[in-house]
Amino acid sequence: ARIIYGVDEKKSGTMICKGEKYEPRSPKDALLKGIGLIPEDRKQQGLVLGLPVGDNVVYSILDKCSKAKVLQKKKINEIVNQYVEELKIKTPDKNQLVKNLSGGNQQKVVLAKMLATNCDILIFDEPTRGIDVGAKQEIYTLMVKLAEQGKAIIMISSEMPELIGMSDRI
């Protein structure tokens, strides 16, 4: 997952994405190709724990939320509100520090950040690790909905029943 997303360097082989040779050198390269990663370790790799929910959601799309290098607060608020509502992120408000959310809601913030980039391919690396049963079901439902919308989902999990239950192909 980290190689596909451009975090780690590939040692050998060839990757093809959308019919073209694909060699990401950074996550930015992956995002430009429409590939997003919901990482295994959300606290170390997916979130900035000391920032509010809203800032985490738009972190990957700040360039799209600015005009002449000035952030457009109205646009940012619309995006954040859309994903907080759509993903049912339980937070008192978008200024709540993400470190104070439950594991399931933190995972939804990571997902919101990737959805805001409008990626066509989403890599879910251990998407339900460390979250409660209710949040797991919500994540599963979101993954199915994304697949129905035409998004390609790559799921990595150490739980075989989870893979069997969620996958078209293994």
PLM feature spans:
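Glycine-rich phosphate-binding loops of nucleotide-dependent enzymes
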Residues: 1-170
